[in-house]
């Protein structure tokens, strides 16, 4: 097995066994309207109950989704650092019912909306601070099960 093959196998194994799972969901009352979101983490960094956020100004649903992802990633980084964990050793599984966010962050869809581009760039930058990560889409019912909405 070559070094590249070993590295790829190690990365795949790490993704099969994440240290931290982040589940997030954002939305808006009206679209655009008052933005809100919730996230929960499990594993090496845990929130306990879901963390709830409200966003100032008028937000689209997609903006609120991205903003909640950012809040969740920042939370994991803060808590890891506060407990002496090196974020580069963490393998993060991010789960969402937002097909748009999952596909854009994964690079399969382009970010066409100007307002989402800085949020997308920041999310990608935060994800680079972890050892490895993967985004997974799940049905809306999973978000409801984890977050209560």
Whereabouts are the PLM-identified features?
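RNase H catalytic domain
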Residues: 27-31, 70-149
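RNase H-like nuclease fold core
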Residues: 2-63, 67, 74-78
């Amino acid at each position: 097995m070559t070094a590249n093959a070993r590295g790829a196998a190690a990365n795949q194994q790490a993704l099969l066994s994440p240290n931290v799972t982040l589940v997030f969901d954002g939305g808006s009352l009206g679209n655009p309207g008052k933005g809100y979101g919730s996230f929960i983490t499990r594993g090496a960094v845990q929130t306990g109950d879901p963390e709830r956020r409200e966003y100032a100004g008028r937000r689209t649903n997609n903006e609120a989704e991205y903003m909640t992802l950012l809040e969740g990633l920042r939370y994991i980084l803060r808590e890891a650092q506060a407990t002496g964990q090196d974020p580069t050793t963490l393998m993060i599984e991010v789960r969402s019912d937002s097909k748009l966010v999952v596909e854009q962050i994964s690079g399969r869809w382009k970010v066409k909306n100007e307002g989402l581009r800085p949020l997308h760039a920041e999310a990608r930058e935060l994800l680079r601070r972890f050892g490895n990560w993967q985004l997974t889409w799940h049905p809306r019912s999973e978000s409801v099960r984890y977050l209560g909405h």
